[in-house]
Amino acid sequence: MKTFRTKKNYLIRIIAAIFTVAAVFSVLICFALHFYNSSISYTSSGFAPANDILNNPYCGWYDMFGYTISDACADTFDKRTQDYIQKSGSTRLVLLEINLKNFNNTELSDNALAQIDRIFTMWSESPHAVILRFLYDWDGKAMQTEPDSIETVKLHMRQTSDIVNSHKNSIYIMQGIFVGSFAEMHSSHYMDTSSMTELALLLDSLIDDDIYLSVRTPQHLRTIFKTADISKLKSDGHRIRMGLFNDGMLGSYIDVGTYGPENYHFSDEEYDKKGNRSQEIAFQDELCLLVPNGGEVVLDNKYNDIDNAA
């Protein structure tokens, strides 16, 4: 019996010692934390509401500037670009439209390519992210000014792609596939399904993956990639970088032809059809969690009054 009590007392003493050590250790930690925190100093500051513009990257309003490329020397647009950069000081997005109509039936000259590179270089030294659009028309007359052959459009894509890729850190997204009135992918020799798809996929293969691409309508995107299933787009690293630029935004109930009337509908089997406004917006809600969506508000009307636009 005595041996049992001795062992029991010994065990109690061990447990007590463990608790004592733990308590002492806890006290030491508290002292250390107190000493550490007491060495930190800070200066309090008052805060007040402000209505200043928040220049968040890659979103918000953009300024739009255009260049008609020629065979003149590389620094032809230096003064104009400097003026543009000064004018757009309050925004962080700019849409640069590069008009190639002077070369609509020939390759771009070395001087022309040097001009384009110089323009991008100057903008890359500014705090702006660039939305880029190549085009052949500013007057709604693309059928008269775009190349007579699709091969010339493809040549221009190849010629400009290296320059674009070398400025991928400042070029955020490209709009369109070079063709159509205002490069908005309508009123063109090359907007049949075959030609449109050929140009879009060529551009996709040429442009660095770090730069987003975009097409004018959801119908265009579905037609190019032959699916209305966004989960299929998610499985393809190249396809998922293609967003939308809605240049008919709030111009009418169907955004000036972006959507169809209420009886329009697309399906998995008829992916190349145009849907009504509700169906297309639901499609965009899912797609544009993954890629950018932007565009231009046009035509003053009741749909872009503040109550409706909100």
Where do the model's predicted regions map?
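Active-site groove signature of glycoside hydrolases
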Residues: I131-K141, T160-T193
